[in-house]
Amino acid sequence: MPGVQDRVIVVTGAGGGLGREYALTLAGEGASVVVNDLGGARDGTGAGSAMADEVVAEIRDKGGRAVANYDSVATEDGAANIIKTALDEFGAVHGVVSNAGILRDGTFHKMSFENWDAVLKVHLYGGYHVLRAAWPHFREQSYGRVVVATSTSGLFGNFGQTNYGAAKLGLVGLINTLALEGAKYNIHANALAPIAATRMTQDILPPEVLEKLTPEFVAPVVAYLCTEECADNASVYVVGGGKVQRVALFGNDGANFDKPPSVQDVAARWAEITDLSGAKIAGFKL
């Protein structure tokens, strides 16, 4: 199958960890890769070119095609330049893996607006900026593949990560609508929540767990989602440690009221409303 052969894929946050592995895997499968990384610290401070350059050199040493980009996804101009790098170097852009991210953890009681805003700017706004810059090219060529990095912190919650969880679940809302708007243009958008040992998780999970969670388990799934053959759209996957699973929202049959209910009416049927024993994949309609 063609896979990603001769496709141009942008990977943001590709200077290390999961992003690096995504870039290496895609290049190994024949894609031309834009290796974007600001080169900063885990909390988003600082910048540098070494991280992206090293990944590009590694790809080229193996006979692959790659170019480095050091712009920030958190600004419209930076994102536009990331896509421009793909167009200038390879003449097209066929896919985006929105992976760039930072961490500024803290309980909600102590969450400053600065730390809330910084995380949303990179994860959620960063996803918007880069995809918005690529979108006209996807539409024009009637082809595009989008993979955003969500997180179990957004899907299920995680103590001390209100900013991160909100941003990551926001990306799921983004791909749900991109999938609808892009379908007629053969643009598919999916989300993947990776569980892997990287600098983002090195002090969150115990060492005996981290050693089983290498990025190599995750990257092939990301690469497959970038292929033309993958027909999935608006789907969310949790991947790590050898397990690949789809997750989705579920809904039950609920309760129907013929007239506006009282609080007591709602309370009387609350068990029926909340019972998920017969739940099915959710979609809302009256």
From Swiss-Prot:
GO terms for molecular function: 3-hydroxyacyl-CoA dehydrogenase activity; enoyl-CoA hydratase activity. The active site is at Y164 (proton acceptor). One of its GO terms (biological process) is protein pupylation. NAD(+) binds at residues 11-35. Its EC number is 1.1.1.-. Substrate binds at S151. Belongs to the short-chain dehydrogenases/reductases (SDR) family. This is Putative short-chain type dehydrogenase/reductase Rv0148.
